[in-house]
Structures are given as structure tokens and as C-alpha cells.
Amino acid sequence: MNKDLLLSSYDYTLANELIANYPTNPKEDARLLVFDRKNKEIFHTTFKNLQDFLPNCAIFFNDTKVIKARIYGNKVSGGKIELFLHQPFLNSHNPLFLAQIKGRVKKDEILYFKKDLKIRVVELLNDGLRKVQFFQNDKTLDTSNLYNLLDKIGHIPLPPYIKREDEKSDLKDYQSIFAKNLGAVAAPTASLHFSETMLENLRKKHEIYHLTLHVGAGTFKSVECENIQEHKMHSEFFNIPQQACEIIDSKQAILGVGTTVTRTIEYYARTKTKSGFCDLFLHPQNPPIRQNHLLTNFHLPKSTLIMLVSAFIGREQCLKLYELAIKEKYRFYSYGDAMLIL
């Protein structure tokens, strides 16, 4: 079988010391590895110098906003419960949500949280997932009311590889400066590097566009089948404004900031769907057909994200750059350094 289709072909070893538990401060001082595909050139610089390397292109950002999706409560017996909200079921008659619950629960069990919030376990699903319903003062909560309540009692859902509790600093650090549409349970991390000053400078030379893709917990889901074509990609809600669609439909060069932007642009390029659910899986045998350049962080081994990067530059080249980044002590994952692919 073609090695590009084998899960084991996307593996690498990373020392724990290179996993960033906090962002660089100031954030634009993060390091940036630049790879020019045309000339096969590699540059090591800092993120604040990004504009020095950018060609004439439109820049697309994901303006999703991370909700405080992790809450702690109790069973009626007093046993502790941790719930991680994934997403709403948009087509259900009653407001129902998909959630992951740590702790054994039964169907129809009631769980108790702060601010008189109660949860009824509606259905037990696979992989520790549960279909749940939220109540406050015995009134069913819809998505908007739930998100408002979570803002008061919830915790920022840091990724599983950050081995610490969320802190006050994460409220700002794990949210992009242009985040506005609530619904993500993970940040589009390439966006986290941008400061207001950097954004202002970019606007002077580049057209800036926003789209929304609510990053789901599936972004952390590991690929488990050796033939990656058998992997069932997670689905996430997206919306693209008309003006952004027109740029995608044009021949204007595009820089996508982050893998979520890439998947949204490429889904639209294939389907002409402006709003819906994106489950596009990009890899070397299913490469991008529209986006020209990519800005992204360094991703987990054997993840769909490293496969997406490989779709741009080839699997072997991707692994070589990761090997170089490890040698040069770049910081990895959500709070880590960045890579620009031209």
C-alpha cells in the first residue's frame, strides 16, 4: 500500500519538554519556521516577522470563539463528575447536547452543578459520549442560554496534552483577538499568535477575511485505522460570508491561518456550500485544490492535522521539517510555535 495512506507513516517522537504548556510572552515572539515550497528554502525567524515573508495574498481567519466547555459537578450520591461539552444537536426537537462525562452515569440520571444547573443523561453513546439535556430552575436551556451560563461557571477546555488546570491567563491566551462567534470547544491555535498591532499592520498590505468553523472535540480524536482512508472524519459546523466566498471563487492567492480555515475553504471549493457541516479529510492523496499558503502550529503525530500539512508539502517533507523543528527546539502544539508554508 502507498505509504501516504498508512497511519504509521505519520509518526514521530517528541520529548515532553517541547510541548508548550503556556504561550510565549509576548505571543508574537513565538518562533516561526518558514518553508518555501518553490525554492525548497527554510528560514528560522520569529512570528512578528511574518509579514516579511508573505506574498501578495488574501488572509483568512477563523473567528470562532471558545466556550467554557468544561464543568464540574456531583451525582446525587455525592460522587464527583466532570463534563466536557462537545456540541448541540441542532435538529433535535428539544435542546440536546453531545458531551463527554468522566465518571459512571446511567440513562436518565440527574447530575448537579453550580447555579442550580442540572443535567439529565438522555442516552449513553460510544466512546464515553453522552446525549444530555440541561436545566436551570427546571427550565430547559437552549444553546444561547447554556453558553451564557457556562461563561459564569465553566472552565476553558485546555487540550489533553496540556497537563495542568486552566488558569485565569487562559481566558485570554486560549482565545484569538478576533474571536466573536461562540461555539468552539478548542481554539484555532494558529490564530493565537496575532496581536492587535500585527493585525493592523497586516491590514495595510493584505485583504483580511473571516469565516467561522466551530472547532469540535473531534480535532483531538486519534486516527485508529492503519489505512487512513478508513478513518471517519469528525463533522463541524461552518459558515462563510458571501464576500469571503467571492474571494475563494476568484483566482486571488489565499493564506489560510490554521487547519480549520483550510478545511473550510477546501470544503467550499469542492461543494460551493456556504454553511453547514464540514467533514473534509485532507491528506496527500486528497490534497488542497484552492488554498495556496498555510500558517499553522506543529501538530500531534498520527493526527489528521499533520496529514493535512502533509497534503500541502508531501509526507516526507513534512516529517523532515518536524525533525528539524525538534532539533532546533521549537515548541509544539496549541501554545507552541508556528510554521508558514509558502
UniProtKB/Swiss-Prot annotation:
Catalytic activity: 7-aminomethyl-7-carbaguanosine(34) in tRNA + S-adenosyl-L-methionine = epoxyqueuosine(34) in tRNA + adenine + L-methionine + 2 H(+)
Keyword Cytoplasm: yes
Molecular function per GO: S-adenosylmethionine:tRNA ribosyltransferase-isomerase activity
Top EC class for this record: transferase
Entry EC number(s): 2.4.99.17
Listed HAMAP family: QueA
Similarity comment: Belongs to the QueA family.
Name by which UniProt lists this protein: S-adenosylmethionine:tRNA ribosyltransferase-isomerase
Annotated organism of origin: Campylobacter jejuni subsp. jejuni serotype O:6 (strain 81116 / NCTC 11828)
Lineage: Bacteria, Pseudomonadati, Campylobacterota, Epsilonproteobacteria, Campylobacterales
